[in-house]
Amino acid sequence: MTTNEQKMCGFVGLFDIRQKSDALRTQVLKMSKNIRHRGPDWSGVYCGERAILSHERLSIVDPQSGGQPLFSRDGKLVLAVNGEIYNHREIRDELAGEYDFRTGSDCEVILPLYRKMGVGLLEKISGIFAFALYDIENDEYLIARDPIGVIPLYIGWDRDEQFYVASELKALEGVCTTIQPFLPGHYWSSKEGKMVRWYDRDWFEYDAVKETGADIPALRAALEAAVKRQLMSDVPYGVLLSGGLDSSIISAVARKFADRRVESHDRDRAW
């Protein structure tokens, strides 16, 4: 999506609670208020004995029913996400008959994939994202960030060693005594208790690609496919031009597909 990341959703999470969660709920809501500019359309909160998730939403896909945090049908999983899952329609088709989706949100696919694949879901989804998922029944959580870190994410600990996660640094300031950025292409599972790289490709190393020749047609096809899938939106979108070559090329490609909605596989006209 061509939306500026600073105008996307935001969330604050608290895990490993060692105090009464009711007392901490007010604190987390105050922290979330510091990033409310990221999500003016909806504010939602989950408050449990061992975890709290607060979400500020900017509606792009499924504005009517995609409010967060998202819950699984049985209410045992709760999810807060900032980002977009571009291949959610394909995943929904694959899970037809296996999972009863509650909303049209692109991010809801994370819930059944977690049940089915655990951290393996990260290789299944295509998009830009930062999310925190809490398994209420087992008191376990999973936090993850997209491959190159398009979506911001930070973590921290307070004096009682309670664990926080937030979309912006300022949500953690004044509460956490230790703060650090959450690395791109990594996840943090409560089972492992540390940051683990999940996105690792051989082309990270120059030696693996130094003999690879240029393939202009393949590059063009990949660029057009990337732009097209990121036009997914249930609200009108616009483009800001910086005057550089990259924004001009992306705008030209977007114009090529702008007349039809990618959500309906080009069957319906766009706005």
What does each of the following model-derived ranges do?
Residues 2-271:
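Cysteine-centered catalytic environments shared across enzyme families
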